Amino acid sequence: NSRRLGFNLCASAGDEMTTTVADYMDWCLERDDTRAIGLFLETVRDPEQFVAALEKASARAIPMVILKIGKSALGASMAITHTGAIAGNHAVFQALCQRHGVIEVDDFDEMAATLMLFQNERKAVSGKFAAAFESGGFRELVTDTAVGLDIEYATLDASTVNTLEQHLDPGLKAENPLDLWGSHDRFE
């Protein structure tokens, strides 16, 4: 636990000789204080129970974030020698994740950042994206990422553009994403 990311359970299923990852998932899903579940996952030893837990998470709108290891052929062979686990075909696992709305991440930093998003009481809503930056470079970086992920920017309506134009420095365009360079102190 830290000030930025709190846990109500941190557990290692180890070789899953008595308690499986799916058992821990189910236990967390029965708790009222569970906002998200993050898994560092080598293999799925009980596919039926695992899928049932994914379905339960989806029904309760509990986000699942999974860092799956053993994705490469070499990594999968190491899983066998580490715990006797068969890592399985990663494309099949990805399809399972996509079907159940699971967020698959590639490293611990991405996992922590993703889980922090769900720690907040506010829920993200579907729709288009709007953003404001104090740096044109950051604006370009986020735009490149958004385009790569097929995320659409929202179009600003005329009244929003008019309001922004009254506060922006000359030369800055009232558009989404917005470059606030030098004007950020005029907005609350």
Where do the language-model regions lie?
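Catalytic-core regions of core metabolic enzymes
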Residues: 1-188
